[in-house]
Amino acid sequence: MSTLFIADLHLSVQEPAITAGFLHFIQREAIHADALYILGDLFESWIGDDDPEPLYRQVAAALKSLQQQGVPCYFIHGNRDFLLGKRFAEESGMVLLPEENVVELYGRKILILHGDTLCTDDTDYQHFRKKVHNPLIQKLFLWIPLRLRLRIAAYMRNKSQQNNSGKSERIMDVNSKAVIDAFLRHDVSWMIHGHTHRPAIHSVELPMVTAHRVVLGAWHVEGSMVKVTADNVELITFPF
């Protein structure tokens, strides 16, 4: 018995090898799991559930097949696909979770999240995040014609890449205090997240206990998953 976690696949039509790797992962690994959790940035971008891109239908069909075979799939939004909504969730069979969620697995309480909210030193990003998560702004954006949304999304991606190229590695990583606060706020000793693309298992000293923060890797040249069983929590890389 095991539960699997993945994040930061950044699926797009420009990277067919990653999509193929994800579909193989569904057929080879996820099908045998108790559940699959996707912790954000499944897609490189998401401009609305009404986007007819065939890639999205392909991914939805694979996830729906997984659900129909008895493996539930849960999703937490990332900074790239935060507009993914109920329509796609229903099409794919995924259950949408809040941005911070505690799951109990095999005797462990684990906090799961995308991870961008932990990067509090990146104040420019946090200000931007607050704006784009405003329900009114999201509603207005989704009201814009699809073709214009595509152009806006492309512009924002380019701008983000330019901004990040000038930021220090420290600023774009998690803030230690934010991590400790999250552990204490949810009263857990395990955390799994993505976003930073820095796969590792970190020990975090809390009052009376040593906690563990597990960071998923991005799917660039290989896959990354966390496998939780009754006996262990493993961070695993694998070829596509």
Swiss-Prot record:
What Gene3D superfamilies does this protein's entry cite?
A: 3.60.21.10
Q: Per its record, what are the GO molecular function terms?
A: manganese ion binding; UDP-2,3-diacylglucosamine hydrolase activity
What cellular-component terms does GO give this entry? cytoplasm; extrinsic component of plasma membrane
Give the cofactor binding note. Binds 2 Mn(2+) ions per subunit in a binuclear metal center.
Q: Which UniProt keywords apply?
A: Cell inner membrane, Cell membrane, Hydrolase, Lipid A biosynthesis, Lipid biosynthesis, Lipid metabolism, Manganese, Membrane, Metal-binding
Q: What is its EC number?
A: 3.6.1.54
Tell me the residue numbers annotated for binding substrate.
Answer: 79-80, 122, 160, 164, 167, 195
Concerning SUPFAM superfamilies, the annotation shows:
Metallo-dependent phosphatases
Instruction: Identify which top EC class this enzyme belongs to.
Output: hydrolase
Report the main location listed first in the record.
membrane
Annotated residues for binding of Mn(2+) 2: 41, 79, 114, 195
Stored InterPro entries: Calcineurin-like_PHP_ApaH (IPR004843), LpxH-like (IPR043461), Metallo-depent_PP-like (IPR029052), UDP-diacylglucosamine_Hdrlase (IPR010138)
Q: What is the catalytic activity of this protein? A: UDP-2-N,3-O-bis[(3R)-3-hydroxytetradecanoyl]-alpha-D-glucosamine + H2O = 2-N,3-O-bis[(3R)-3-hydroxytetradecanoyl]-alpha-D-glucosaminyl 1-phosphate + UMP + 2 H(+)
Q: In which pathway does it act?
A: Glycolipid biosynthesis; lipid IV(A) biosynthesis; lipid IV(A) from (3R)-3-hydroxytetradecanoyl-[acyl-carrier-protein] and UDP-N-acetyl-alpha-D-glucosamine: step 4/6
- Compartment(s): Cell inner membrane
Q: Name one GO biological process term.
A: lipid A biosynthetic process
Regarding the membrane, this protein is recorded as:
Peripheral membrane protein
Q: Which cofactor does it need?
A: Mn(2+)
Return the similarity comment: Belongs to the LpxH family.
Biological role stated in the UniProt entry:
Hydrolyzes the pyrophosphate bond of UDP-2,3-diacylglucosamine to yield 2,3-diacylglucosamine 1-phosphate (lipid X) and UMP by catalyzing the attack of water at the alpha-P atom. Involved in the biosynthesis of lipid A, a phosphorylated glycolipid that anchors the lipopolysaccharide to the outer membrane of the cell.
The protein's matches in PANTHER family, at most eight in alphabetical order, are given as:
UDP-2,3-DIACYLGLUCOSAMINE HYDROLASE (PTHR34990:SF1), UDP-2,3-DIACYLGLUCOSAMINE HYDROLASE-RELATED (PTHR34990)
Mind telling me what this protein is named? UDP-2,3-diacylglucosamine hydrolase
Q: Which gene encodes it?
A: lpxH
